[in-house]
């Protein structure tokens, strides 16, 4: 099994790069995000590799970081997500952004991936929500609040305040973070209107 390749960029295809390693050209399939960050032909590059062996072919997938490769593997544990969809997701969201989106139950962010509809996005978030916090870089309290809202366990004023901010055009992660901060400031029993005011102040900082 090939775990890493280091060589010179030979050429690019629509969804792959040819990496020249000691005179042998390896065709490595990558996300659009990875391809955009690789250097020009003739320059050196290093890719972490995931090797797929089938009866009729051997296929290599390349990643700039081990974390990106790990997300490629995790995504494919979700029903209906294969290598092509996993690469598309990683082409739309950087690994850290994907982790944050899943941890915060932000299905809309995942659904921005071409070819990923609301149902697949929901499965990705639902099936990976317990794994994402380990990779996310958001306040655990915000993750907890977003999960409570998604599971309909959050107090009604909190859920309504987040919904109001989303309706004003803020993203789900921004709204959840702002209302989490507002809830800490206001204390228990705060009404929706107060949370919205405090949340908007937080977003204006």
Swiss-Prot record:
**Localization in the cell:** Cytoplasm
What exactly does this protein do?
Answer: The RuvA-RuvB-RuvC complex processes Holliday junction (HJ) DNA during genetic recombination and DNA repair, while the RuvA-RuvB complex plays an important role in the rescue of blocked DNA replication forks via replication fork reversal (RFR). RuvA specifically binds to HJ cruciform DNA, conferring on it an open structure. The RuvB hexamer acts as an ATP-dependent pump, pulling dsDNA into and through the RuvAB complex. HJ branch migration allows RuvC to scan DNA until it finds its consensus sequence, where it cleaves and resolves the cruciform DNA.
**Family membership noted in the UniProt record:** Belongs to the RuvA family.
A single GO molecular-function term is: four-way junction helicase activity
What is the primary gene name for this protein? ruvA
Gene Ontology annotations of biological process type: DNA recombination; DNA repair; SOS response
Q: Where is this region: Domain I?
A: 1-64
Which InterPro entries does the entry link to?
A: DNA_helicase_Holl-junc_RuvA_I, Hlx-hairpin-Hlx_DNA-bd_motif, NA-bd_OB-fold, RuvA, RuvA_2-like, RuvA_C, RuvA_C_sf
Free-text comment about domains: Has three domains with a flexible linker between the domains II and III and assumes an 'L' shape. Domain III is highly mobile and contacts RuvB.
Which species? Bradyrhizobium diazoefficiens (strain JCM 10833 / BCRC 13528 / IAM 13628 / NBRC 14792 / USDA 110)
> Residues of the signal sequence?
none
One Pfam family from the UniProt entry?
A: RuvA_N
Chain residue ranges for the region called Domain III:
154-205
Which parts of the sequence are annotated with region: Domain II? 65-143
Which keywords does the record carry? Cytoplasm, DNA damage, DNA recombination, DNA repair, DNA-binding
Describe its partners and assembly state. Answer: Homotetramer. Forms an RuvA(8)-RuvB(12)-Holliday junction (HJ) complex. HJ DNA is sandwiched between 2 RuvA tetramers; dsDNA enters through RuvA and exits via RuvB. An RuvB hexamer assembles on each DNA strand where it exits the tetramer. Each RuvB hexamer is contacted by two RuvA subunits (via domain III) on 2 adjacent RuvB subunits; this complex drives branch migration. In the full resolvosome a probable DNA-RuvA(4)-RuvB(12)-RuvC(2) complex forms which resolves the HJ.
In which broad location class does this protein mainly occur, judging by the first location in its UniProt entry? cytoplasm
Report the coiled-coil segments: none
Q: What is this protein called?
A: Holliday junction branch migration complex subunit RuvA
One GO cellular component, as annotated: Holliday junction helicase complex
Key word Nucleotide-binding present: no
């Amino acid at each position: 099994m090939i775990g890493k390749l280091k060589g010179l960029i030979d050429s690019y295809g629509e969804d792959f790069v040819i990496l020249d390693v000691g005179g042998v050209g390896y065709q490595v399939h990558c996300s659009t995000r990875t391809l955009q960050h690789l250097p020009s032909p003739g320059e050196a590059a290093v890719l972490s590799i995931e090797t797929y062996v089938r009866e009729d072919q051997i296929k290599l997938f390349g990643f700039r970081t081990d974390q990106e490769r790990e997300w490629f593997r995790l995504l494919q544990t979700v029903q209906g997500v294969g290598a092509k969809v996993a690469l598309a997701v990683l082409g739309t969201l950087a690994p850290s952004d994907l982790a944050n989106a899943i941890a915060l139950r932000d299905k809309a962010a995942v659904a921005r991936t071409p070819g990923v509809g609301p149902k697949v996005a929901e499965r990705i978030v639902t099936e990976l929500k317990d794994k994402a916090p380990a990779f996310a870089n958001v306040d655990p309290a915000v993750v907890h609040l977003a999960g409570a809202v998604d599971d309909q366990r959050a107090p009604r004023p909190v859920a309504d305040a987040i919904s109001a901010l989303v309706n004003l055009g803020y993203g789900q992660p921004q709204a959840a973070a702002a209302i989490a901060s507002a809830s800490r400031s206001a204390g228990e029993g705060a009404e929706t209107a107060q949370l919205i005011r405090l949340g908007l102040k937080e977003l204006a900082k």
